[in-house]
Amino acid sequence: MAKPVQIEVWNPNGKYRVVSTKPMPGTRWINLLIEQDCRVEICTEKKTILSVEDILALIGDKCDGVIGQLTEDWGEVLFSALSRAGGKAFSNMAVGYNNVDVNAANKYGVAVGNTPGVLTETTAELAASLSLAAARRIVEADEFMRAGRYDGWLPNLFVGNLLKGQTVGVIGAGRIGSAYARMMVEGFKMNLIYFDLYQSTRLEKFVTAYGEFLKANGEAPVTWRRASSMDEVLREADVISLHPVLDKTTFHLVNKESLKAMKKDAILINCSRGPVIDEAALVDHLRDNPMFRVGLDVFEDEPYMKPGLADMKNAIIVPHIASASKWTREGMATLAALNVLGKIKGYPVWSDPNRVEPFLDENVSPPAASPSIVNAKALGNA
């Protein structure tokens, strides 16, 4: 028998039982569920990662839906339990769902939700922040000051790289990659080289227009080029930001060989998925190339880092906070809750999961729809 876990209960007499495996930012998501007669149970266990057994205890004998997190293992065991309890939906509070066995969810008829369309800009902002912090060696300088080592100005103290006029490389020019590229091009007047299987016409038009604006005002125009291969980006870019999906073709996309292809003083940024980088190879490269710098928000074996990474002064490492702006995290919680609510109430699936603004306007009621169900087609309700 599963050991009971600590919970906080809202609207105890609600008709539908919805469980959240973690406390989530804001209260709008709770209120939206309560307004539709849901009893909301929030797990308050002091654990960063809940085990399968913990979640089984939360599901119990009757559960209409669960809001969960990327750190949880949602497979055969949990989906079968949720189905037996009468559950109709599970939603990650995340865009990604690598932690979810969608085939198992399909087998038991459980809808799987995610939260795209709300974290594009905030993720791109963090990638841009890491780029600037790495280029100007901000973290090293901060640690230097806090250690009381500053005796006065020196001409060679923490000399970094000027971004203006350099080339930013983007691998994966989807929504986040394109938003990052626009920030770096317009914010720092960098030239762009990008690689994507699909042409990013909108991004190209943006850079072209900005280049024409600069030229008209007597400045050197920025340029763009779509690379024919990822290796081309790695060889030519001064700052490289990774924004691919994670699948078999992108696992260890950056490895020992590709690291060698980069400039000795290049900057590598990853706010996408940890396993796209061979982290052990990266540690070796950082050790052997002290002018090479990296900014990481995600890790190959998260929450763990490969041995030696934390010791690298030329690495900036942050704990998966790309979406950690107040508006974004509250929006993610709202979308996840509405995914579950929509399936409980029998609502249709929203037509465009990347255009979710109508669900996020706090001044109006959200549409009667599930914002994003990744297996809607498989379940026959696309």
Swiss-Prot record:
The keyword Lyase does not apply. GO terms for cellular component: peroxisome. It is found in: Peroxisome. It is an enzyme of class 1 (oxidoreductase). InterPro entries: D-isomer_2-hydroxyacid_DH, D-isomer_2_OHA_DH_cat_dom, D-isomer_DH_CS, D-isomer_DH_CS1, D-isomer_DH_NAD-bd, NAD(P)-bd_dom_sf. Keywords: Glycolate pathway, NAD, Oxidoreductase, Peroxisome, Photorespiration. It comes from the Eukaryota. Coiled coil: none annotated. Pathway: Photosynthesis; photorespiration; 3-phospho-D-glycerate from glycine: step 3/4. The keyword NAD applies. Disulfide bonds: none annotated. Induction: The appearance of HPR in the cotyledons of cucumber seedlings is both developmentally and light-regulated possibly at the level of transcription. Its EC number is 1.1.1.29. GO terms for biological process: oxidative photosynthetic carbon pathway. CDD domains: GDH (cd05301). Belongs to the D-isomer specific 2-hydroxyacid dehydrogenase family. This is Glycerate dehydrogenase.
